[in-house]
């Protein structure tokens, strides 16, 4: 019996052979890579990957799909919500930096990206299929309409690029949005910063993104003992990533 895509899992299965080949080419898997695939689904991407790798670890939440995948002798199947997976344990077991790939469920793609952010020091690279509008925000530059909290929180830790456009008809069932593939490579020497403090600052800044920050981030900085110079007569989208990082480094630590 054919598997029916489940809306609650945000399932849209890749079915275009040409697109699949293009994605595999961008990933460039090599035998022995410590690769982990999130959401393998019906194995459209899984099969060409494992043919090149020899072995592949996959994370699948859907019980029926996980059962099917276990029939493949070259796959290690982790039946779990990816947000509960300890990627540090996987990296330790592989004794190598992880390569993480996947057609991410669009309904929880941002939480997955933030979950992986905590393991970036253990990851060699990431290749994900996502909504194109999400990738546009991820790679956006300051002073553009797509520049957002997501832009800042990923760009301080990754070098990213949109490598492939994927139209809706490449999926079954077709989503109502355009998709794309993003490459994410963790920076070899990221700035030394408290990620939680940076996240707090960025969240406050973008809480009213169309207004100047005098009454949002400016007020927050005063309340947290910041004694440096910061122009709060700007909108959050006008502030470069490096300046947010510098703020997080300069604000006194919590008592």
Curated annotation (Swiss-Prot):
Keywords: Cytoplasm, Methyltransferase, RNA-binding, rRNA processing, S-adenosyl-L-methionine, Transferase. It is found in: Cytoplasm. GO terms for cellular component: cytosol. PROSITE patterns: RRNA_A_DIMETH, SAM_RNA_A_N6_MT. It catalyses: adenosine(1518)/adenosine(1519) in 16S rRNA + 4 S-adenosyl-L-methionine = N(6)-dimethyladenosine(1518)/N(6)-dimethyladenosine(1519) in 16S rRNA + 4 S-adenosyl-L-homocysteine + 4 H(+). It comes from the Bacteria. It is an enzyme of class 2 (transferase). S-adenosyl-L-methionine binds at residues 12, 14, 39, 60, 81, 103. Its EC number is 2.1.1.182. Pfam families: RrnaAD. GO terms for molecular function: 16S rRNA (adenine(1518)-N(6)/adenine(1519)-N(6))-dimethyltransferase activity; RNA binding. Signal peptide: none annotated. PANTHER family: DIMETHYLADENOSINE TRANSFERASE (PTHR11727), DIMETHYLADENOSINE TRANSFERASE-RELATED (PTHR11727:SF7). NCBIfam families: ksgA. Belongs to the class I-like SAM-binding methyltransferase superfamily. rRNA adenine N(6)-methyltransferase family. RsmA subfamily. Specifically dimethylates two adjacent adenosines (A1518 and A1519) in the loop of a conserved hairpin near the 3'-end of 16S rRNA in the 30S particle. May play a critical role in biogenesis of 30S subunits. This is Ribosomal RNA small subunit methyltransferase A.
